[in-house]
Amino acid sequence: MTDVRDRPFGNSLQAVLANLNVLNSARCFTAVATLLCVMVTLEPFPDLSNAELTNIASGRMAITYICFGALATIAILLSASETALALKTLWTPLHLCFVGWMVFNIAFSESPGVSLQRFALTASVMSLAIMMPLLPATQNDFNQCFAAAAIILLALCYLGIILAPEVSIHNAADLAEPFLSGDWRGTFVHKNIASPVMAILVYLGIYLTSTGAFLYGPAILIFSGAFLVFTGGKTASALCLLVYALASIVCVTKGLWLKRAICFVPLLFINFLTVGSVFSDGFANLTKQLPIDSTFTGRTDVWEFALGAFRERPILGHGYAAFWDKISNGQTVDGAEWAVTAAHSHNSYLDLAVTIGLPGLMLVILIFVLAPLKNFQVIHARDESGPLTRLFVTIWLFGLYFGTTESFLLDRQNPTWFMFVVAVAGLHFLARFPVRGESGTLSSK
């Protein structure tokens, strides 16, 4: 048998194998697998014309729980020895209060079993998202993992559009929403899930290009941007560039209070115009003066119904992820009976108030709204707010504003929620453990 070492290819292969770090490769593989499980999902290209789709999905939930639970365990085991110090910083009184409140909320939920089951999945997904900034060994590995997952996702989405449009594009055969016919959804179950993911991939493409990835960076940017347009997702499309501009301003603003004003004043204003238009005639009249649909494509009926539910249990809430499954007998005002068939309240903040109560909502705001900006201020004060920090800030801001018309916060394996947690965790770790060099790791040693 010929010795491969005598051949140039054999020498190259031997060099590659000699330099291969098995642990780092396993960590990268786990990161990519996680991203694909979240974004492509375990059930890609669902057939929305199939009346049994919901039953089929429910019957396969065990696979989802096992998959995310296993990935979370593997991710922690692969990197725990190097990231233990970073993970210890998550054990704060605020985070422990949040966990404690969730336990309390689940115990007093209207459907404790449902809440517990769904929070178990959410906890696994959150663990994976928190590990994502730590799992790749270097920033270059981080870039390559996210780029690989984005390219695979985009390739699958476009192949679906070309080869199987009946399960990649909303059409008249869809049982639930045939009026969305023509809107692209790719591998996702709905355009409103596809569109925010594509907006986030636009930010990823910009980030990768800024780090010198002049081939796949622009490719991800262009193809995700084009797909975003064809999804017909109005909220994500409108926010994509507006949030990027807002993030750009925040990244050059010095003071923390000025940053807070720039980030949160428009956010409060939008919430007042949207949900506020339901309980305030003044905000309703102001909304009607704007060149937009004052019902926000029918969302006002859902908000009115959700506000009524919130008033029933403002402190305890109805139970994590347990309310919208049990409202088939609910009542709304005349002409808005369809609101009881909604899957969520179409506003992340209102949805949390309904399900986990005001204390839970306040804790979420402290952890996921206020703390990330404070962490960014720490990074900015050290003059270390590079492209990676800017990516996290942009995704975080996009999530805050997207949540004004869609419910995704604490939404189990929702890809927008997953990427939002990645951004929040990234800012948390960067504020405490700066990246060492252009391709260094998060220094947690």
Predicted regions and their residues:
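Alpha-helical transmembrane segments of multi-pass inner-membrane proteins
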Residues: A72, V99-V103, N143-L175, F179, ...
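Hydrophobic transmembrane alpha-helices and their immediate junctions
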Residues: T83, L134, L215-Y216, S248, ...
